[in-house]
């Protein structure tokens, strides 16, 4: 056997029969059994998940339980199987690979191990590196309020749009002594910055992306940037040099080669080899032609001290935010085709803005709309324990009864004003997928339309003023 802990796992799972979880999941016992048999009976099967799994209080536990399900059915450690997060953007995996996590250096080498701190301190030419791990972005409001974080340097991110409980995030930014934003467009966060550093877009520089399957692939500059703009790595290098820590890289290959020499799993993925193969999945530990990467993990053993995979599950915990008579509906924040992520890029595209613009939409079920007296396309108020926003109703049978779906990119209808700061105790990820709300019709639609126009114009004017300094 390549696993351990099955007996403990079975004891917990036995308490959750298909019939007993119908009310929790909204899925019938028959359908649960049918899905289980389809998965268990497949020759090869892969589980893919998105933010609907991870953005819950028990997100980590759910992912580990999915992994145990794959272990139970033999769907780990061989070709064409596995458990796979569908990452939110094309280089989320790459950012993690490079150490953009609070507890690891590049290559998932943990800060807590002295040998890793010593290795990176020597390579980076400093006497020592801190023993403690960093903080997660969702912790910023509380850390800033207590003086534990005094400055923020933000690249390609808009936390004043995308983070939960935006009123608390704004207060956190007010508590900071210095905010630097490095981006390609003005955002709400850039408008709150003390320093704005314009950078190049994806078509104006080169580098390496990592896909969700651990695949490195080079990308190349398509056009020269205008106005003598600098790339992200050039900006960071110049700032570091002026602050007394010289960085004299000449190109991205020098940076990549430094990284390879510090990360054994990446060492064999040279620019030359990527150029020949087009794509290399790490681990790739040898520069020779023979090592062309690793198509799947755990062929021989698992990444545990004894090489055995460990079964895991736990008892279910209900979402933290509770439904009441005042807040009887469940808001889930989602993404939709049309605008990308927080809309900092696609919001500047006139064609896309013409298709869908402020204040965005709240999707609600037809029966709920009839009960509340809400017509399709009418402006409504959506209220939670943390905030209140105006948006436009989109009435259909797509959402379940009692459910509200909202995309998080709208500036006026910013649904993250509503989301409570209930964080996973492990990852500190907010529970974006479960927020108790109510939807309130607006009697004077003409006044509401004018209110949206006025608020939108004020926001755009503030962004222009911030951009002009």
Give residue spans per PLM region.
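Long, well-ordered, tryptophan-enriched scaffold segments
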Residues: 1-42
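A glycine-rich, hydrophobic/aromatic-adjacent loop/helix-cap motif
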Residues: 39-142, 213, 285-291, 300-308
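Short, well-ordered beta-strand core segments
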Residues: 45, 152, 179, 193-198
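Long, low-complexity segments enriched in small/aliphatic residues
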Residues: 86, 93-102, 119, 254-351
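Phosphate/diphosphate-binding loops
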Residues: 168, 175-178, 182-187, 221-241, ...
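Flexible glycine/proline-rich, aromatic-decorated loop/lid segments
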Residues: 184-220, 410
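Long, contiguous, secondary-structure-rich segments that constitute the structural scaffold
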Residues: 226-228, 232-280, 347-363, 367-469
């Amino acid at each position: 056997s390549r696993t351990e802990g099955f007996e403990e796992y079975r004891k917990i799972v036995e308490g959750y029969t298909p019939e007993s979880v119908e009310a929790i999941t909204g899925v019938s016992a028959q359908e649960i059994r049918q899905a289980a048999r389809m998965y268990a009976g497949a020759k090869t099967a892969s589980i893919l998940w998105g933010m609907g799994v991870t953005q819950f209080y028990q997100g980590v536990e759910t992912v580990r339980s999915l992994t145990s399900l794959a272990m139970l059915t033999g769907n780990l450690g061989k070709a064409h199987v596995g458990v796979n997060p569908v990452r939110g953007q094309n280089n989320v995996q790459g950012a993690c690979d490079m150490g953009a996590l609070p507890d690891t250096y590049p290559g998932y080498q943990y800060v807590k191990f002295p040998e890793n701190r010593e290795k990176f301190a020597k390579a980076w030419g400093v006497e020592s590196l801190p023993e403690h791990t960093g903080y997660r972005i969702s912790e910023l409001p509380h850390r800033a309020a207590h003086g534990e974080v005094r400055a923020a340097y933000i690249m390609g991110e808009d936390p004043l749009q995308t983070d939960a409980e935006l009123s608390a995030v704004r207060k956190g930014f007010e508590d900071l002594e210095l905010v630097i934003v490095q981006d390609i467009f003005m955002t709400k966060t850039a408008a709150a910055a003390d320093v704005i550093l314009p950078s190049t877009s994806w078509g104006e520089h080169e580098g390496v992306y990592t896909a969700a399957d651990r695949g490195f692939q080079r990308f190349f500059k398509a056009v020269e940037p205008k106005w003598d703009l600098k790339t992200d790595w050039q900006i960071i290098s110049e700032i570091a040099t002026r602050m007394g820590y010289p960085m004299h890289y000449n190109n991205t290959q020098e940076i990549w080669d430094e990284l390879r020499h510090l990360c054994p799993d990446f060492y064999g993925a040279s620019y030359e080899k990527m150029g020949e193969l087009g794509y290399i999945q790490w681990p790739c530990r040898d520069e020779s032609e023979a090592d062309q990467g690793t198509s799947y993990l755990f062929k021989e053993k698992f990444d545990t001290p004894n090489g055995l995979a460990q079964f895991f599950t736990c008892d279910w915990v209900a979402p933290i935010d509770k439904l009441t008579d005042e807040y009887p509906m469940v808001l889930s924040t989602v993404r939709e085709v049309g605008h990308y992520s927080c809309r900092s890029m696609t919001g500047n595209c006139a064609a896309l803005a013409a298709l869908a613009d402020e204040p965005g939409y709240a999707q609600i079920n037809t029966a709920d709309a009839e009960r509340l007296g809400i017509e399709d396309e009418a402006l409504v108020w959506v209220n939670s324990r943390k905030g209140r926003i105006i948006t436009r109703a989109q009435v259909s049978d797509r959402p379940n009864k009692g459910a509200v779906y909202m995309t998080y990119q709208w500036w006026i209808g910013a649904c993250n004003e509503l989301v409570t700061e209930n964080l996973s105790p492990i990852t500190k990820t907010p529970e974006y997928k479960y927020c108790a709300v109510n939807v309130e019709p607006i009697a004077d639609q003409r006044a509401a339309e004018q209110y949206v126009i006025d608020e939108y114009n004020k926001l755009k004017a503030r962004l222009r003023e911030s951009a002009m300094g």
